[in-house]
Swiss-Prot record:
Organismal lineage: Eukaryota, Metazoa, Chordata, Craniata, Vertebrata
Family: Belongs to the RPAP2 family.
Modified residues (N-acetylalanine): A2
Record-annotated disulphide pairs: none
Region described as Disordered: 1-38, 193-267, 295-317
EC number of the protein: 3.1.3.16
Reported function: Protein phosphatase that displays CTD phosphatase activity and regulates transcription of snRNA genes. Recognizes and binds phosphorylated 'Ser-7' of the C-terminal heptapeptide repeat domain (CTD) of the largest RNA polymerase II subunit POLR2A, and mediates dephosphorylation of 'Ser-5' of the CTD, thereby promoting transcription of snRNA genes. Downstream of EIF2AK3/PERK, dephosphorylates ERN1, a sensor for the endoplasmic reticulum unfolded protein response (UPR), to abort failed ER-stress adaptation and trigger apoptosis.
Gene Ontology cellular component annotations, sorted alphabetically: cilium; cytoplasm; cytosol; nucleolus; nucleoplasm; nucleus; transcription preinitiation complex
UniProt entry keywords in alphabetical sequence: Acetylation, Coiled coil, Cytoplasm, Hydrolase, Metal-binding, Nucleus, Phosphoprotein, Protein phosphatase, Transcription, Transcription regulation, Zinc, Zinc-finger
Biased composition (Basic and acidic residues): 193-204, 307-317
Documented effect of changing C105A: Abolishes interaction with RNA polymerase II complex subunits
Entry superkingdom: Eukaryota
Protein name, UniProt field: Putative RNA polymerase II subunit B1 CTD phosphatase RPAP2
Length: 612
C-alpha cells in the first residue's frame, strides 16, 4: 500500500508548479491588456481633446471674422485653421448683422432683393442670387468664392502634418459675377461626343467652370456657326446605319459608289456656288443662276426623263439626310449684318433729323387731328350750351319763313317729303357736316298727309262707337299692354354705360392739364368744374376720339377754356383776360404754334347764327 501511495503524492507535487505558472501567465496578459486599454484610452482622450481644441479655435476664429477691420494677413492666417463650412458660417452670420459677407469688406448691406433668380441682359443668362444676397457687390461675392475655394476640406485636427496652402486674394481690378448660373437647357450631343465621351466631359466641365467667370461687364460674344447632324433625334443611330450601308455598298460593287460620289460632288458644287451669293447684291443673281442652269443641262443631257426624275428624288433625299445644318451665324456674316444694321440706323437717324428739320409737318398733323376730334365732339347741344337755349329757333326762323312763302294750297295735300327739302336740309345741316351720324341724331321721315287723315278718321270712328256703346275693347288693347310691358327696358347704370366712362376719362385728362392754365385767371379747378362737366356732357364721344397725347390734351384744354371764359364772366379786355391771353401766347410759342392756330380750333365752335 505504501508503494502505491508514494508515486501519486509525487505527481501531485509536480502538478502544483504548472498551475502556478499558468496563473502567473494569465495575470501578466491581463495586466498587459489593461495597460494597452488604458494607453488607448489616454490616446483617444488626447485625440478628442485635440479635436475639441481645434474646433474651439475654429469657432473663435469665426467669431473674430464677424468683427470689422479685418486685415488680409489675418484672413489668410485664419484660412489654415478653418474649413469651408466654418467660412460659410462667417458669411451667414455677417449677412444677419447686415454686414457684407466678405470679411475684408466693411460696407453694410442695403436693400436685399426678395427674388431668387436674376436675368442678366448683358450675358443673356439666368443666375441664382441666393448666395449673392449676402454681399454688397459682385466683386465681394467673387472674391469670397475665390478665397473659399482655396480653404482645405480636410479636418482641422489632421492638418499638422500637411503642408499649409498659400492663400491668394482676388484683386479689386478683377470684375465679379452676378451669381451661380442656372443651366436652363443641356447642350446638343454631336457624333464626335459619342466617339470620345471623355472629350465631351472635359468640355462640359470647362463650360460649367466658365460660368463662374462671367462678369457683370461681359462684352457681347461673337456668333459662331457649327455643323451638326441634320436629323438630331436619330444622331445616335448614324454610325450603325453608315456601317450597314458600307457593307451593302461593298456587295453592290464599285459602280454604285461612283454614282453616289458623283451626286455628292454635284451637291457640294451647288452649295459652294450658292454660298457665293449675297442677300444685298442683285448683280450676282445672274451669275448664281448660270451655274445652276449648267448643272441642270448636264444632268438632262446625260440621262433620260425617268432617270432625271429618279435623280431629283435622290437629290431631295440626300438634302433631307444631309449632315450639314447651320446653327447660329458665322463671324463673317455677323459682320455683314452689323454693317446692314448700321446702315438702317443711319437711315432712321436721317429720317428723325428730317423730322426735326421740318416741324411744320408735325404741326400740320397735330392741328388736323385736333380739328377732326373737335368736329366729332361738337353737337347741337354743345352750341345750345355755349350760346343759349334759343340757338336752334333763331337759326331756323328765316329758312322756315322762306319755305312758307313758297307753299300753295295744293302742296298741303301732296306728300310733304317732296316739298320740304330746304327745311329738312336746314335741320340736318349740322349732322351732315359731321364725319358720321349717330343713331340718336338721325331724324325719322315725316308721315304722309293721307296716312294721317286715315288715322284721324279711325280714331273718330272709335270714339263714336265707344259713346254709342257698340265699341268693344278687343284683343288690341291687351296686346298693346303686353307689348308695353314687354318693351319696357331699364337704362344703363353709370358703371356700365360706355358714354359715361368716356366722359369720365375726358374729365380726368382735362383735370390734369387745367390747373396750370388757371393760374393767370386766379381761379381754381373747382370754380369751373361744373361748367366743364356740363360742356363735356354735350360732346359726342367715341372710343377713338378720346385717345390723345399730353400736348394734344393741353391744346384741347386751352380751346375749351377760351370757350368757357365768357360763361364764367371773364371779359377779353379785362386785366385777367389780358394776362390769360399773354399766358396762352407764351405757351403756344413753347409748343411751336401761333395764336392763329388756336383760333382755327376755337372757330369750330363759333357760329354766325347768334340769338337776337
Amino acid at each position: 500500500m505504501a508503494d502505491f501511495a508514494g508515486p501519486s503524492s509525487a505527481g501531485r507535487k509536480a502538478g502544483a508548479p504548472r498551475c502556478s505558472r499558468k496563473a502567473a501567465g494569465t495575470k501578466q496578459t491581463s495586466t498587459l491588456k489593461q495597460e494597452d486599454a488604458s494607453k488607448r484610452k489616454a490616446e483617444l482622450e488626447a485625440a478628442v481633446r485635440k479635436k475639441i481644441e481645434f474646433e474651439r479655435k475654429a469657432l473663435h476664429i469665426v467669431e473674430q471674422l464677424l468683427e470689422e477691420n479685418i486685415t488680409e494677413e489675418f484672413l489668410m492666417e485664419c484660412g489654415r485653421f478653418i474649413t469651408p463650412a466654418h467660412y460659410s458660417d462667417v458669411v451667414d452670420e455677417r449677412s444677419i448683422v447686415k454686414l457684407c459677407g466678405y470679411p475684408l469688406c466693411q460696407k453694410k448691406l442695403g436693400i436685399v432683393p426678395k427674388q431668387k433668380y436674376k436675368i442678366s441682359t448683358k450675358t443673356n443668362k439666368v443666375y441664382d442670387i441666393t448666395e449673392r444676397k449676402s454681399f454688397c457687390s459682385n466683386f465681394c461675392y467673387q472674391a469670397s468664392k475665390f478665397f473659399e475655394a482655396q480653404i482645405p476640406k480636410t479636418p482641422v485636427w489632421v492638418r499638422e502634418e500637411e503642408r499649409h496652402p498659400d492663400f491668394q486674394l482676388l484683386k479689386e481690378e478683377q470684375s465679379g459675377h452676378s451669381g451661380e448660373e442656372v443651366q436652363l437647357c443641356s447642350k446638343a450631343i454631336k457624333t464626335s461626343d459619342i466617339d470620345n465621351p471623355s472629350h465631351f466631359e472635359k468640355q462640359y466641365e470647362s463650360s460649367s467652370s466658365s460660368t463662374h467667370s462671367d462678369s457683370s461687364s461681359d462684352n457681347e460674344q461673337d456668333f459662331v456657326s457649327s455643323i451638326l447632324p441634320g436629323n438630331r433625334p436619330n444622331s445616335t443611330n448614324i454610325r450603325p446605319q453608315l456601317h450597314q450601308k458600307s457593307i451593302m455598298k461593298k456587295k453592290a460593287g464599285h459602280k454604285a459608289n461612283s454614282k453616289h460620289k458623283d451626286k455628292e460632288q454635284t451637291v457640294v458644287d451647288v452649295t459652294e456656288q450658292l454660298g457665293d451669293c449675297k442677300l444685298d447684291s442683285q448683280e450676282k443673281d445672274a451669275t448664281c443662276e448660270l451655274p445652276l442652269q449648267k448643272v441642270n443641262t448636264q444632268s438632262s443631257s446625260n440621262s433620260t426623263l425617268p432617270e432625271r426624275l429618279k435623280a431629283s428624288e435622290n437629290s431631295e433625299s440626300e438634302y433631307s439626310r444631309s449632315e450639314i445644318t447651320l446653327v447660329g451665324i458665322s463671324k463673317k456674316s455677323a459682320e455683314h449684318f452689323k454693317r446692314k444694321f448700321a446702315k438702317s440706323n443711319q437711315v432712321s437717324r436721317s429720317v428723325s433729323s428730317s423730322v426735326q428739320v421740318c416741324p411744320e409737318v408735325g404741326k400740320r398733323n397735330l392741328l388736323k387731328v385736333l380739328k377732326e376730334t373737335l368736329i366729332e365732339w361738337k353737337t347741337e347741344e354743345t352750341l345750345r350750351f355755349l350760346y343759349g337755349q334759343n340757338y336752334a329757333s333763331v337759326c331756323l326762323k328765316p329758312e322756315a319763313s322762306l319755305v312758307k312763302e313758297e307753299l300753295d294750297e295744293d302742296d298741303i295735300i301732296s306728300d310733304p317729303d317732296s316739298h320740304f327739302p330746304a327745311w329738312r336740309e336746314s335741320q340736318n345741316s349740322l349732322d351732315e357736316s359731321l364725319p358720321f351720324r349717330g343713331s340718336g341724331t338721325a331724324i325719322k321721315p315725316l308721315p304722309s298727309y293721307e296716312n294721317l287723315k286715315k288715322e284721324t278718321e279711325k280714331l273718330n270712328l272709335r270714339i263714336r262707337e265707344f259713346y254709342r256703346g257698340r265699341y268693344v275693347l278687343g284683343e288690341e288693347t291687351t296686346k298693346s299692354q303686353d307689348s308695353e310691358e314687354h318693351d319696357s327696358t331699364f337704362p344703363l347704370i353709370d358703371s356700365s354705360s360706355q358714354n359715361q366712362i368716356r366722359k369720365r376719362i375726358v374729365l380726368e385728362k382735362l383735370s390734369k392739364v387745367l390747373p396750370g392754365l388757371l393760374v393767370p385767371l386766379q381761379i381754381t379747378l373747382g370754380d369751373i368744374y361744373t361748367q366743364l362737366k356740363n360742356l363735356v356732357r354735350t360732346f359726342r364721344l367715341t372710343n377713338r376720339n378720346i385717345i390723345h397725347k399730353p400736348a394734344e390734351w393741353t391744346l384741347i384744354a386751352m380751346v375749351l377754356l377760351s370757350l368757357l371764359t365768357p360763361i364764367l364772366g371773364i371779359q377779353k379786355h379785362s386785366q385777367e383776360g389780358m394776362v390769360f391771353t399773354r399766358f396762352l401766347d407764351t405757351l403756344l410759342e413753347e409748343l411751336h404754334l401761333k395764336n392763329e392756330d388756336l383760333e382755327s380750333l376755337t372757330i369750330i365752335f363759333r357760329t354766325s347764327c347768334l340769338p337776337e
